[in-house]
Amino acid sequence: MKLSGILLIFVCCWSGTSRAANVNIATLTCVKYQNEVIAAPNPAPGSDPINTMMWLFGYSVAKSGAHVMYGDALASFGFALDAECKDNPAESLLEALSAVKPNTKNPMDLTELECQTFAARHLDLVKSDLESANTIMMWLYGFAVAKAGGHLFDADAVGTFESALMGDCQKNPGRSLFDELTGVKWGKSKSP
């Protein structure tokens, strides 16, 4: 009897964490995003609010039509998204992302960055500062999902995305990072 009770608790916890990993930003309201994703009382194992915000930031930049990474804009983007969601709690997160405009200081044009240069820098950063490398990869992942027309955030798929992107950069070292991001294939999370 004890074993079946433990098994039941494990199954409930397991199903809860798998649901937490996938977020449909087209149907998620701002109020749910703020209460259940960013400030979740019981966050899913491995969840990281900064990486979630980076994914949303990359997604927002791609949806705006821009092809740049703004190195100094994460904080202002986060505050602007927070304000948009507080002012419009019933709005979908996808709509809120469309309304938020990032600070455009210090842009890095992804069309001018060769894939081989990015890959070398990324591998160096992985060795020296894994957390920062993962955070940047999360931004690129959000950007690629938006470019593919998707609207699902699956934090568990960032590793698959990273492997696919790095593999594509190895095959096409002279292509721009932007071109690779718009064509990378990494599995079911790419589209809705």
Could you describe each region identified by the protein language model?
Residues M1-G5:
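Positively charged n-region of N-terminal signal peptides that target proteins for export
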Residues G16-A20:
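Sec/Tat signal peptide C-region and signal peptidase I cleavage site
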Residues V23, A39-E112, F118-P192:
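Compact alpha-helical subdomains of small soluble proteins
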